[in-house]
C-alpha cells in the first residue's frame, strides 16, 4: 500500500525545508509568490493533503463559520448561502449550516448554545438575534453578523436590502399600471423586514391620496392553504393588485388565480427568485444585488476575525424592480 504523502516528502521534492512548505501552505507573506506556486503545484501532484485538525489545534481556530437560517425550501436562502459559502471556501473556511427547527425566526439562547457547542469561529445569522443570545455569545466573543433583517437594538452589524424602498417601488409600479385596490400578503409582524415593506407600501398610498385599508393587509405564514384563503379574501375585497412578501407566496397566489381562470389581477413579489420556481407566468419582483451583499458581509466578518473591534455597521443595499 502506498504510504501517505507527508510535509517532509513535499519539502524534499521541492528542495526546501519543511518550515518553508508549511509557511507556503498557510499563505504567509514572507514566502514569495513564485515559491508558493511551486510548492503548491508539487504538493498537489504528490497528493499531499494538509492536516487541518493539527493546524487548528495550533492556531486555536476551527476555520469554520456557522450560517443560521429558517427556511430551507426558499431558493432565496439557498442562493445567498451558496454565494457566501463559495467566498468562505476560497478564503480557507468551511461552513456549518444550522436550521431553526422551532420555526420561530429568531436566534435565541437555545439555538445559540447549539451553535457555540460546535466551536465555530464566527456566525452569520439570517434570523433575528435576540438580546439574550447576543449576551451568551459575548462570553465566547465570536464575531457575528445579521443578514437580511435589521436590528432594533443597533448592537449587531447588519447587511440588508432596502425593504422600505422595495415596498415603495412595487406599490408605485402597481399604481402606475392603474391598480387602485392593492392588497398585501405579508409574513408575521415580528419580522422587521416585512414591517418595513408594509411601511413603504403605506407611504406611497398616502402620498397618492389613497385611504389605507388595513383589511387589505394580511399577515400569515407560507402555508399554501393560508395563502389560498388570503387570495380569495382579497378577491372578495375587490383587489385588483396583490403584493406578496416573497416570490414563493406570489407563485402560490398565481397558481390559485390561474386554477380559477382569473387573469386580470396583478401579482408582485420580493427576492426575484422566479427562475428557480415553477411559476405559471412571469411577475414583477423586487431584487437586490446578492453578489455584493454576500461579498461585503463575509469580508466584514472575516475582518472582525482577523482584527477584532467593537465597530458596528448597518449596510443597506439598494433594490430595484425586475419585470
Task: Show the residue positions of the predicted features.
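Flexible loop/turn connectors
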Residues: 230-241, 245-323
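Alpha-helical recognition/docking segments in bacterial nutrient-uptake
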Residues: 2, 6, 60-172, 232-237
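Short, solvent-exposed amphipathic alpha-helices that sit
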Residues: 38, 76-90, 166-169, 192-211, ...
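Short beta-strand elements in bilobed, periplasmic/extracellular small-molecule ligand-binding domains
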Residues: 88-100, 202-225, 321
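An alpha-beta-alpha
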Residues: 168-210, 309-323
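N-terminal helix-turn-helix DNA-binding module of bacterial transcription factors
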Residues: 1-61
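Hydrophobic alpha-helical segments within soluble ligand-binding/sensing domains
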Residues: 157-184, 199, 203, 223-232, ...
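Short beta-strand segments enriched in small/hydrophobic residues
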Residues: 20-23, 57-73, 173, 182-188
Amino acid at each position: 500500500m502506498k504510504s501517505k504523502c507527508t510535509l517532509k516528502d513535499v519539502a524534499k521534492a521541492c528542495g526546501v525545508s519543511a518550515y518553508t512548505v508549511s509557511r507556503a501552505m498557510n499563505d504567509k507573506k514572507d514566502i514569495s509568490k513564485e515559491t508558493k506556486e511551486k510548492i503548491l503545484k508539487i504538493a498537489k501532484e504528490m497528493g499531499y493533503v494538509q492536516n487541518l485538525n493539527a493546524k487548528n489545534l495550533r492556531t486555536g481556530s476551527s476555520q469554520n463559520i456557522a450560517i443560521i437560517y429558517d427556511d430551507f425550501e426558499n431558493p432565496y436562502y439557498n442562493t445567498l448561502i451558496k454565494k457566501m459559502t463559495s467566498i468562505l471556501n476560497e478564503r480557507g473556511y468551511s461552513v456549518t449550516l444550522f436550521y431553526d427547527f422551532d420555526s420561530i425566526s429568531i436566534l435565541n439562547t437555545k439555538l445559540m448554545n447549539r451553535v457555540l457547542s460546535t466551536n465555530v469561529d464566527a456566525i452569520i445569522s439570517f434570523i433575528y438575534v435576540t438580546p439574550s443570545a447576543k449576551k451568551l455569545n459575548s462570553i465566547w466573543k465570536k464575531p457575528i453578523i445579521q443578514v437580511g433583517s435589521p436590528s432594533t437594538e443597533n448592537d449587531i452589524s447588519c447587511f440588508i436590502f432596502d425593504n422600505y424602498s422595495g415596498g415603495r417601488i412595487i406599490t408605485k409600479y402597481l399604481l402606475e399600471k392603474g391598480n387602485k385596490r392593492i392588497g398585501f400578503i405579508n409574513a408575521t409582524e415580528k419580522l422587521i423586514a416585512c414591517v418595513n415593506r408594509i411601511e413603504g407600501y403605506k407611504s406611497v398610498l398616502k402620498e397618492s391620496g389613497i385611504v389605507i385599508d388595513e383589511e387589505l393587509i394580511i399577515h400569515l405564514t407560507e402555508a399554501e392553504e393560508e395563502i389560498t384563503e388570503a387570495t380569495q379574501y382579497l378577491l372578495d375585497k375587490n383587489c385588483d393588485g396583490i403584493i406578496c412578501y416573497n416570490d414563493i407566496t406570489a407563485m402560490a397566489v398565481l397558481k390559485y388565480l390561474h386554477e380559477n381562470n382569473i387573469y386580470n389581477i396583478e401579482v408582485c413579489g420580493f427576492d426575484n427568485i422566479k427562475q428557480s420556481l415553477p411559476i405559471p407566468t412571469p411577475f414583477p419582483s423586487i431584487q437586490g444585488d446578492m453578489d455584493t451583499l454576500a461579498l461585503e458581509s463575509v469580508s466584514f466578518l472575516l475582518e472582525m476575525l482577523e482584527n477584532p473591534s467593537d465597530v458596528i455597521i448597518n449596510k443597506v443595499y439598494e433594490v430595484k424592480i425586475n419585470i
